[in-house]
């Protein structure tokens, strides 16, 4: 299959298996959920009655005071006591096979092509790390919500895009399923397309 290169008369021949796959919603959902789960910090921690600092002495005798019986000031029903089912740090990451991950990326790229959201350009670069310059370049291309993918990370582009809303710059190694579906348009250079095909082969 062929992808039209914007601003050029030629088309880029690409692999049908990478850019022409069927849309697999279940697979994409599973991979995106796993990706989001892996980003969770999972470091929250509370103390049980065994871990709260304090005396283990019985506050008052069992009988004869008229008060409710109590054996421990660290009881969960007491103020500043322990937590009954205390949360502990945990790893939320889910295992995703390489074949599944690559399949999800291919499925997303193919759907982007079908929806005319994948914009292929010969090159995408600016002379200086100026946000104003990049903003104008995107405006000229009628883009205001875009992920820009280059073969290698362009420092000028990266620095210029940091202060632009809904604009991000990645190299091929930095793409992920969430970023691919988060933007309205995905701008990718010809060299980056070739690298993506090699990576997903």
Swiss-Prot record:
Instruction: Select a single GO molecular function from the record's annotations and give it.
Output: rRNA binding
Q: Which GO terms describe its cellular component?
A: ribonucleoprotein complex; ribosome
Is Chaperone one of the keywords? no
Which SUPFAM superfamilies has this protein been placed in? Ribosomal protein L4
Q: Where is this region: Disordered?
A: 44-71
Amino-acid biosynthesis found in the keyword field = no
InterPro entries assigned to the protein according to its UniProt record, in alphabetical order: Ribosomal_uL4 (IPR002136), Ribosomal_uL4-like (IPR013005), Ribosomal_uL4_dom_sf (IPR023574)
Q: Which GO terms describe its biological process?
A: translation
Look up the coiled coil feature and give its residue ranges: none
Q: How does it assemble?
A: Part of the 50S ribosomal subunit.
* Role summary: One of the primary rRNA binding proteins, this protein initially binds near the 5'-end of the 23S rRNA. It is important during the early stages of 50S assembly. It makes multiple contacts with different domains of the 23S rRNA in the assembled 50S subunit and ribosome.
Q: Which family does it belong to?
A: Belongs to the universal ribosomal protein uL4 family.
Q: What is this protein called?
A: Large ribosomal subunit protein uL4
Which species?
Actinobacillus succinogenes (strain ATCC 55618 / DSM 22257 / CCUG 43843 / 130Z)
């Amino acid at each position: 299959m062929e992808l039209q290169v914007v601003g050029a008369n030629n088309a880029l021949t690409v692999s049908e298996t990478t850019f022409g796959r069927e849309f697999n919603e279940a697979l994409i959902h599973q991979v995106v959920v796993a990706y989001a789960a892996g980003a969770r910090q999972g470091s929250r921690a509370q103390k049980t009655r065994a871990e709260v600092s304090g005396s283990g002495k019985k506050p008052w005798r069992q009988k004869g005071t008229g008060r409710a019986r109590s054996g421990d000031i660290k009881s969960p029903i007491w103020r500043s006591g322990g937590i009954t089912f205390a949360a502990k740090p945990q790893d939320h990451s889910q295992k995703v096979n390489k074949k599944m991950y690559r399949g999800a990326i291919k499925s997303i790229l193919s759907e982007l092509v079908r929806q005319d959201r994948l914009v292929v350009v010969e090159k995408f670069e600016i002379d200086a790390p100026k946000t104003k310059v990049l903003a104008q370049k995107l405006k000229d291309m009628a883009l205001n919500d875009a992920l820009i993918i280059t073969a290698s990370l362009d420092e000028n582009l990266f620095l210029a895009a940091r202060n632009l809303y809904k604009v991000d710059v990645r190299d091929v190694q930095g793409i992920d399923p969430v970023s691919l579906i988060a933007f309205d348009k995905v701008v990718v250079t010809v060299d980056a397309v070739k690298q993506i095909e090699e990576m997903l082969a």
